[in-house]
């Protein structure tokens, strides 16, 4: 039997990152354990997207450490990081608009270098999760609805066989019913496949219900953390992110 694995899958320590002289991250500490869903919430401009992008090396960390699976990846080039089975669905989806759904999914699979049978297994899994995509395999990405594009962005990330999936605002701009489908899919991936997820959301209510733990970021710093349930109960969270906010 191997020793219990107490080391987080992703450990971020004292992370700083800047755009020119704008300091977007000012010493962030955040852990994601294997098998967890962790939500990162915070107002516009807090630095949430920057945190995710810094894991991929763009922008580069100016100080602090990013440790993934025990490996210091703080200064690793972006193309190396994609091969470490970390996948990202960035804010604004960024699918390939001129490519078909099938081609978009293939782009994700190319990162994984899986065998033919692994690819077809992964494709089945994505199309079972998002049957909508199955009906639209030959349609251009750019002509999909917002919800379908989000499904495609997540599907493409899944095709790279990630251990850690980072999602930046997957529910942004989606009707509540479609947003719920996306959150349900994330829950299924976590529960069935043990996928580890770091999710950035302004929809704090949904995100904290979905997540095992959450962090609140204000102005480049983590100001609060706890279980999803604990954070949902906190009056300052309710006031800032739930009551009267985007639900
Ligand atoms: N490419 C860039 N160049 C200069 N400043 C940037 C750039 N990207 C982000 N910033 C600044 O860094 C800060 C953090 O931005 P970031 O996009 O990480 O916030 P966020 O929490 O994801 O916000 P939102 O909820 O609006 O997506 C903001 O002040 C933003 O203006
Ligand atoms: Mg953002």
Enumerate the language-model features and the residues they cover.
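Glycine-rich phosphate-binding loops of nucleotide-dependent enzymes
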Residues: 2-247
